[in-house]
A protein has these predicted regions:
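Charged, low-complexity intrinsically disordered terminal segments
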Residues: 17-161, 165-496
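Positively charged n-region of N-terminal signal peptides that target proteins for export
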Residues: 2-6
């Protein structure tokens, strides 16, 4: 484990220790925000979480203070510092009586099956795996077989990212549960974005979780690994819990900066509440499975329809930030139609130099001339943007590693008043295969905030402005350009 995540989690644990155990989450909200509970009866409070550290602190604080239930749904849950310590915090919540349910997609799960069983052995913890046909409990032979016999199913993933606390507070957005999504990887971090919610939209988020949890796609880990369950003893589960707690409580894991930072951490959560913007919030989601599969790798979905509707109705401007930019069928034509109507379209995305996904970039690379001809303004993020010290307050301590930054936020502003923040990438996979979630909000205030953030990422010191005469593709090694050239030859666009 590296020192920087230890430093943050030390702060989180000390912050949590300052809160009165057993205090109801709603009561704490009422005590620290005089009119929040009254507003929550009809409106949803929303606070955009731009920085990884505040997004992580918010999750940790809510996990520590939930009293009844915590329901989390993620595409990726790593076994790195953030993933391990997040699991420890959930286990700690379960030990004080909170019902914890975890739903994770099967494709990119890091944890070994036995570790999952040891955690789910706690009576207050349930773990289910979405569409388990690749990793958990799947042999190498079965995995190869599934490529040929269940190709669409293998590619249909749950890309949702939600965390719900006592049915009162919720967080959704682009961040998975791993170091690089919270600015705590020393070498590569994502420029990401979440949104914290209080109020009716959280009820809609909860309904979506229940639909996925009870669907035929969500399989209890004990059912997947039934042959291993019998080998798990209470002593094994207790040892696993003790190991997690020992790591979290070991002062040797904490950096010397903790005492200085703790005085400020305790002020953060009330400050987040004071910065809430209150309005109607529409939570959008897909049904489990995305669609009925009758159109193969196509078919669209509820989230696809809603977002394309928002773009189609634009009157004067569309501003998009997406890590991957491969428009599905009809997308470029729609942008051209909008541009001809006088709608200004600007998109912030990754460059070849910053991207973590060369195959996805290849799809964008092929479409880029057509996007430019359609009137779209393109801004490609630099791997070492000038903004990096503002994204991460502790950047000076990382500078020696020269870390790469890449966009992972999925956001949109239409006509300076409608925003989207969620999990939807502007690519065929999000449009047709992966289930997605997010929020659509009509708010000039939040639109101004989000526009400022994206436009800052598009400044010359942070992004290259790609045109028909200039692209930054040569700002990378020859090896990466050769990789791009090879991938460009493959017919994989529907899967990107």
């Amino acid at each position: 484990f590296s020192m920087q995540p230890r430093f943050l989690w030390a702060c989180i644990l000390l912050l949590c220790a300052e809160v009165t155990p057993g205090q109801e989450l709603t009561q704490w909200i009422d005590d620290n925000c005089a009119d929040c509970l009254e507003k929550m009866e009809t409106l949803t409070g929303a606070r955009i979480l731009e920085q990884g550290e505040e997004a992580l602190v918010g999750r940790a604080w809510l996990t520590r203070n939930a009293q009844q239930s915590i329901d989390v749904q993620y595409f990726i849950w790593s076994t790195d510092n953030v993933g391990t310590l997040a699991a420890e915090q959930l286990l700690r919540a379960a030990e004080r009586g909170v019902a914890v349910r975890v739903l994770v997609d099967d494709l990119l799960i890091d944890a070994q099956g036995q570790s999952l069983l040891l955690l789910s052995a706690h009576p207050n913890v349930e773990i289910r795996i979405y569409n388990p046909n690749d990793t958990v409990g799947t042999s190498f032979y079965a995995r190869i077989k599934n490529v040929f016999t269940q190709f669409r199913s293998l590619n249909q993933r749950m890309h949702d990212k939600t965390a719900i606390y006592d049915g009162v507070a919720g967080i959704t957005g682009g961040r998975n549960m791993a170091d690089e999504y919270f600015d705590f990887d020393p070498n590569y971090n994502f420029r990401d974005r979440d949104i914290l919610l209080l109020g009716p939209a959280v009820s809609a988020m909860q309904e979506n979780f229940e639909e996925f949890w009870s669907s035929s796609f969500a399989i209890p880990v004990e059912e997947i690994l039934d042959s291993t369950v019998a080998t798990i003893t209470p002593a094994d589960a207790a040892l696993k819990a003790a190991e997690l707690h020992a790591y979290a409580e070991n002062p040797d894991n904490f950096g010397p900066e903790v005492q200085q930072a703790i005085a400020h951490l305790s002020e953060r959560i009330p400050k987040l509440l004071s910065q809430m913007s209150w309005q109607d919030v529409e939570f959008i989601s897909d049904a489990p499975g995305k669609n009925d599969g009758s159109q193969g790798l196509g078919g669209g979905g509820q989230s696809t329809n809603r977002l394309f509707e928002a773009v189609r109705n634009a009157k004067h401007s569309v501003l998009i930030q997406s890590p991957y930019l491969i428009l599905p069928k009809g997308g470029i034509e729609l942008f051209k139609e909008l541009s001809e109507r006088g709608v200004r379209i600007r998109i912030s995305t990754n460059s070849l130099a910053s991207t973590d996904n060369v195959p996805a970039f290849s799809g964008y690379h092929r479409q880029r001339p057509r996007l430019l001809n359609a009137g779209v303004e393109l801004f490609e993020f630099k791997p070492h943007p000038g903004i990096q010290s503002k994204l991460i307050a502790r950047y000076p301590s990382l500078a020696g590693n020269n870390p790469i930054f890449a966009i992972h936020a999925k956001s949109m502003v239409v006509d300076d008043e409608l925003i989207f923040i969620g999990t939807f990438n502007l690519d065929p996979r999000s449009a047709n295969l992966n289930t997605e979630v997010g929020v659509v909000i009509q708010s000039k205030e939040l639109a101004r905030q989000l526009t400022r953030s994206i436009e800052r990422d598009m400044l010359p010191e942070n992004s290259w402005h790609t045109t028909g005469e200039f692209s930054p593709d040569y700002e990378v090694s020859r090896g990466k350009r050769l990789e791009l050239g090879f991938v460009n030859l493959l017919p994989v666009e529907p899967l990107l």
